[in-house]
Amino acid sequence: MEKIWAVLQTRFAEITPEGKKYLFPPEYFQCLDKGFQNTKPFHPKLHTIRLDEKDRWKTGTMIDFFINCRQKDMFRFAPRIPVVSVQEIFMTRRGSILEISIAKVDSYIGDDDFQLDAFQQGDLALNDGFDDYNDFRNYFLDIIEKKGKETGNYWFKGKIIHWTALRY
């Protein structure tokens, strides 16, 4: 949550003759009231990677930032904002290696896709809110392994949902 607010707070900054002033929406103060405040340094979360089997995520779709979604203690921690862009992502494993390709949406990974090198994969992990690449790799390798055991398909296909101008 703090990693998302690190990005969103710039949307609420206003430059005045006295300096920068922030006009935060109520969700920001509710986070503070609930004790959600991180004092450790971190990299801001610039996007999220999601399955999208129903093709829900498109440019302009409104993002709802919730904790404990669809539960009694559900909590909106940031205001709704539109999706800026979406990219397809395809991950597969080769032993303990995670191979990652990215393409334009609806291109069905092919002509315009490109594979991320190790440095780009590290950036992807940080930008997706993981503390380091190993956490990211292990998270997605577990998902791929579980899917493989269920279906025989050892891969992950989803979307990178951007709320900033960043693209790969």
Q: Model features per residue range: what roles?
A:
Residues 1-168:
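Glycine-rich, low-complexity intrinsically disordered segments
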